[in-house]
């Protein structure tokens, strides 16, 4: 295979309350090796000032920028999808709709659903383990005409101690400056049809376990892998919930190795 053919298109999808900006360390590392990299702001995230989270009622609306990108790809192009944290649900939506346009999907300490339960199942399991104290003062508010939506806005303490505890303080400060309210869309996802084996289930999946994650714990990550086994599992030692800040070079190396394995 020629060097040119080995060049990949990585699509990077952020988690809740974050934006495309959180990939600022990983993106140039991949691009320096000649790969194409697209980092997206999902709806009402990052620098998308056209909407706020209270304008978004479904995960599909929230994920629309990713869906638009996938639609725009030529039929003969396949991408490497990379989703962090809640971004795993956006990946699953894209995988279910565009399985033929994805070489592999990489779940980076991310919610990874299955095909036997509702799309919200792995989130519900996570939410059941969270106490009010566990949110450390984060703002959770209902919204929508029937109050079925639930927005979340991470507190400083939550980000410092549960997300960024091993990451550089400069990146924590960046996150505190740029964070925006988001949603996990649990109620809405619980009413959706299951993801399909023909769509979502047909795309190869890799999972990157972050062993010092203080929010999506290693136990929960491994439970999701046991619940719906990934094709490849990679562990990152001494890594918090934000590996793109904590260990960007190692994360980039893992993404390249995964792409080499599946593309």
Curated annotation (Swiss-Prot):
It catalyses: methyl (indol-3-yl)acetate + H2O = (indol-3-yl)acetate + methanol + H(+); methyl (-)-jasmonate + H2O = jasmonate + methanol + H(+); methyl salicylate + H2O = salicylate + methanol + H(+). Signal peptide: none annotated. It is an enzyme of class 3 (hydrolase). GO terms for cellular component: cytosol; vacuole. It comes from the Eukaryota. It holds the Pfam family Abhydrolase_6. Gene3D superfamilies: alpha/beta hydrolase. The keyword NAD does not apply. This is Methylesterase 2. It comes from Arabidopsis thaliana (Mouse-ear cress). The gene is MES2.
